[in-house]
Amino acid sequence: MKVRKPLKKLENYRFMEVIGRGASADVYLAIDDKANQLVAVKSIPSAKLTQKQEETNLRRELEILYKMKHKNIVGIKNYKKTKNNHYIFLEYCNGGDLDDYCKEYIFRYKHPLNELYIQKILRQIVPALQYMHNNNIIHRDIKLKNILLNFDT
């Protein structure tokens, strides 16, 4: 078995591969050697936070992440700031996003997800949104790409 070398290391975290890219951040799959678990790491270059509003948005995102404690909301594990980057360490969801899952399902089975499976997914999404709304948080970008799946292993 070949052991992969990490792309980079920050304290007890080994960044193994890029699993997502966005306009302002990359997301890495990392290993937390201290907790012996996989985490997702949102890496935001400080250079992307050039305006005061962008810094305010990052602080607000962190406040919300630390406040939200719900089984169907991805939890924050840690936050680190270096000279060049901000790192948000999150629970890793091993199933990818719902958009990719639906596309793969349709490609493989030649029909959309069945109604019972969609209901099962919604029974997990709705309580999370209700919890957020009860805490005066409105998610302004609900879409399949932003719904992450976690399959039992």
Each language-model region and where it sits:
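AlphaC helix of the protein kinase catalytic domain
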Residues: D99-P112
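Activation segment signature within eukaryotic-like protein kinase domains
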Residues: I121-L122
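Conserved short submotifs of the Hanks-type protein kinase catalytic core
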Residues: N84-D97, Y101
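Conserved N-lobe ATP-binding subsite of Hanks-type protein kinase domains
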Residues: D26
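Conserved N-lobe loop of protein kinases adjacent to the ATP-binding glycine-rich P-loop
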Residues: I31-V39
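A short, aromatic-enriched beta-strand patch in the conserved N-lobe beta-sheet
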Residues: N78-Y79
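Regulatory alphaC helix of protein kinase catalytic domains
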Residues: L58, L62-E63
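Catalytic-loop of the protein kinase fold
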Residues: H133-L149
